[in-house]
Amino acid sequence: MGRGGKGGFCMIKLIASDMDGTILDGEGNVPPETFDLIKRLKTAGIGFVASSGRRFDTLQELFAPVSGEMDFVASNGAQVVVAGQLVDREVFSHAALRRLKNVTDLFDGLHLVVFDRKISYLLDDEERFERELDKNLPNPLRVRDLPRPDTSIIKVSIYVDDAVMDMAYILEREMGEDFVFAPSGRKWIDVMQRGVSKATGIKQVMEARHARAEEVVAFGDSMNDYEIMRMVGTSIAMGNGRSAIKEISTKVIGPNTEHAVQRELEALLSMMGK
């Protein structure tokens, strides 16, 4: 735990958590006790932020019982919602996406998905990949080419058949001037615009909520959490997380399959007498 010495919970104003592999269970669901924890945090004066590569509409659905009592950093920072209001939305350049598609087309094992506010555009005709997409991405639409230039693309991901780290390296070499490529899990690479990330989204929430970095706690497991984990006062890595995330974090807890985030939040509230 590379930064140590900041593991105590004091003067917390915001808690940000990643979703998949972090606060969600092994089946990709929000454990039921989470909703009560978020309500209790709000009563205690602590805001909760869902920080994810997922789109806002998906997160809003996941947290439906408490969606009006929390903030959202969605689509890896491209959608930021504070107190129910969209405060920022970053869209991808169509020309840059065209260049990215030309690169991914070189590799049979790379499958590109682009997202607008409602639709997941699957640029692939491989049936196995379509089944993978259907597992957890809403409104999938299989297409032969990028959507029209006037479509507001807010999120881009690449499904990788094998060797996700190698492919992230290749993509960084090919398109690093335009994008950041962050492995997410074993099969996905999140594509982020330069200057747009979960960390930039959290900074906007912090400004709106008047919270300093040392007053923010973040939970995460993957490389798309790296910047935010480095930025906040207390970073808590999952036991199932990537080694690099564990190394730079204040603390390492159990895996998401054991509801470790929920146990940590319960411990915080108990310590506060809430």
List PLM regions with ranges:
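Short, Lys/Arg-enriched N-terminal segments with co-localized hydrophobic residues
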Residues: M1-C10
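Mg2+-dependent phosphoryl-transfer enzymes with acidic/Ser/Thr/Gly-rich catalytic loops
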Residues: C10-L14, P31, D190-K274
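Active-site metal-binding loops of divalent metal-dependent hydrolases
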Residues: M19, G77, G220-S222
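Active-site phosphate-binding/coordination module
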Residues: G26-F129
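Short, acidic loop-to-helix structural element flanking the phosphoryl-transfer center
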Residues: G28-A44, R89-A96, P138-P140, G195-E207, ...
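Short active-site oxyanion
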Residues: G45-V49, G68-M70, I154-K155, E214-E215, ...
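Short, structured coil segments at secondary-structure junctions
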Residues: P65-G68, N76, E174-E177, M231-V232, ...
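Conserved acidic, metal-coordinating active-site core of Asp-based
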Residues: G109-F219, M223-I228, N240
